């Protein structure tokens, strides 16, 4: 693992620090931007050419990251200081082997292995970290799924054991929905659906992400620093809007930090963790954890100072560089710059060479901006950008971010202009 660092080299020279990004989407792109600002050499890897992070990396490789030989060839050629997974579709055995050979897998291979599988994740949260979760059970056949849903009670949630972004998940309102839930998992999971997890429905006030970052302090000891919790909401199980700070009680906020600390202490390593939780009043339940920057955390591009977004925090931790913080009531907290919010810009058409319009209106809104990710292909539901807004009132930031996002229209080579339909879809107002 990286040790505390006081110096950095220069990219493309023999003094360079190198990172390999396994996954080159919008989150990897922001990590790459932060790395470029510190003179770190960036190697981007993904399954398709010209992925967002590849567009600004020093070098890139295209291949199937589920194949160990491909990963070994890239790492052995580049010999990076850190290997940073950004997606789930990675050969986990290869990560363990590379770690055994002395490479730094961020945060560590075991944490990545746990987080990419819902059964391993849930058992780690409930049994090792011993934090509150919703009630849950598992099912491997359709008959078992009927039994599991009856056991947990309706309504409940079913999720493929390996997937992400809501793919293969279903909200089961009654027995009549069980076959559809089974079919959804089998057809749409991004990974394995050999088993489903069935979870109790929590009637929460807000869903939050705590972006806990493990890093070295000034004494060379590993500590955990906590930014303010990020509120978010989803559509079809996928992030649609986020804001910071989440509107929760002080008591709930302290419980969020306590739960995140227990989970990240169990997982170990260095870097940022997106710990997803449900909050109702003062009660908090852990849901899932991602050992890397979280899509809801893009709000920190505005809410945190320059260089200290979740991506900057992740990179500092990975490189062994310091992160400022202040101890309050036993927790090391990272200060916000301003309340802020994001709202996604999603494709509703298919095709190559996406083109955007409405930017004159969108970029005329004070204290707001747009990030377009540079993905070369669109398909319905694919996230192609995000609107970001900031304001002293987080509610106003939410409103502004949604308005800006829905000002953007999209077309591709094979489809005419389509709007985001702001007037028809005022989710937050």
Swiss-Prot record:
Q: In which pathway does it act?
A: Purine metabolism; IMP biosynthesis via de novo pathway; N(2)-formyl-N(1)-(5-phospho-D-ribosyl)glycinamide from N(1)-(5-phospho-D-ribosyl)glycinamide (formate route): step 1/1
Entry-linked InterPro entries? ATP-grasp, ATP-grasp_carboxylate-amine, ATP_grasp_subdomain_1, PreATP-grasp_dom_sf, PurT, PurT/PurK_preATP-grasp, PurT_C, Rudment_hybrid_motif
GO molecular-function term, one example from the UniProt record: magnesium ion binding
Report which reactions are catalysed by this protein: N(1)-(5-phospho-beta-D-ribosyl)glycinamide + formate + ATP = N(2)-formyl-N(1)-(5-phospho-beta-D-ribosyl)glycinamide + ADP + phosphate + H(+)
Q: Which residues bind Mg(2+)?
A: 276, 288
Q: Return the protein name.
A: Formate-dependent phosphoribosylglycinamide formyltransferase
Which Cys-Cys disulfides exist here? none
Q: Which UniProt keywords apply?
A: ATP-binding, Ligase, Magnesium, Metal-binding, Nucleotide-binding, Purine biosynthesis
Which Gene3D superfamilies is this protein grouped with?
A: 3.40.50.20, ATP-grasp fold, A domain (3.30.1490.20), ATP-grasp fold, B domain (3.30.470.20)
Q: What is its EC number?
A: 6.3.1.21
Subunit info here reads: Homodimer.
Of which family is this protein a member? Belongs to the PurK/PurT family.
Residue ranges of domain ATP-grasp in the record: 123-319
Q: Name one GO cellular component term.
A: cytosol
Where N(1)-(5-phospho-beta-D-ribosyl)glycinamide binds, per the record, is at 26-27, 86, 295, 375, 382-383
What's the domain of life for this entry? Archaea
Q: Where does ATP bind?
A: 118, 159, 199-202, 207
Q: Name one GO biological process term.
A: 'de novo' IMP biosynthetic process
């Amino acid at each position: 693992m990286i040790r505390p660092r006081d110096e950095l080299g220069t990219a493309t020279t023999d003094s360079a620090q190198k990172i390999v990004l396994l996954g080159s989407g919008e989150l990897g792109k922001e990590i790459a931007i932060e790395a470029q600002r510190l003179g770190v050499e960036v190697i981007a890897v993904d399954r398709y050419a010209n992925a967002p992070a590849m567009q600004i990396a020093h070098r890139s490789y295209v291949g199937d990251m589920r194949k160990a030989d491909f990963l070994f060839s890239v790492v052995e050629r580049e010999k990076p200081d850190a290997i940073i997974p950004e997606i789930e579709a990675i050969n986990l055995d290869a990560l363990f082997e590379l770690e055994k050979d002395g490479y730094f897998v961020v945060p560590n291979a075991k944490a990545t292995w746990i987080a990419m599988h819902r059964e391993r994740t849930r058992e780690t949260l409930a049994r090792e970290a011993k934090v509150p979760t919703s009630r849950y059970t598992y099912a491997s056949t359709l008959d078992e799924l009927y039994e599991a849903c009856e056991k947990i009670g309706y309504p409940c949630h079913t999720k493929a054991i390996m997937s992400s972004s809501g793919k293969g998940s279903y909200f089961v309102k009654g027995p009549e929905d069980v076959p559809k839930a089974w079919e959804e998992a089998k057809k749409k999971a991004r990974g394995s659906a050999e088993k489903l997890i069935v979870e109790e429905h929590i009637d929460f006030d807000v869903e939050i992400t705590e972006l806990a970052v493990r890093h070295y302090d000034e004494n060379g000891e590993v500590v955990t620093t906590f930014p303010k919790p990020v509120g978010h909401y989803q559509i079809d199980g996928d992030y649609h809007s986020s804001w910071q700070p989440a509107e929760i009680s002080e008591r709930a906020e302290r419980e969020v930090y306590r739960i995140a600390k227990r989970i990240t202490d169990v997982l170990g390593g260095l870097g940022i963790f997106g710990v997803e939780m449900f909050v109702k009043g003062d009660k908090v339940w852990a849901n899932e954890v991602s050992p890397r920057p979280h899509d809801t955390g893009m709000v920190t591009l505005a809410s945190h100072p320059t260089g200290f977004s979740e991506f900057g925090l992740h990179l500092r931790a990975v490189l062994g560089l310091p992160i400022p913080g202040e101890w309050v009531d036993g927790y090391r907290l990272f200060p916000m710059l301003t309340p802020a919010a994001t709202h996604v810009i999603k494709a509703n058409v298919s095709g190559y060479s996406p083109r955007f319009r409405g930017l004159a209106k969108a970029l005329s809104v004070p204290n707001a901006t747009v990030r377009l990710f540079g993905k070369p292909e669109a398909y319905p539901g694919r996230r192609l950008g995000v609107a970001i807004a900031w304001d002293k009132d987080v509610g106003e930031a939410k409103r502004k971010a949604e308005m800006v996002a829905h000002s953007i229209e999209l077309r591709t080579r094979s489809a005419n202009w389509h709007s985001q339909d702001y007037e028809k879809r005022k989710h937050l107002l």
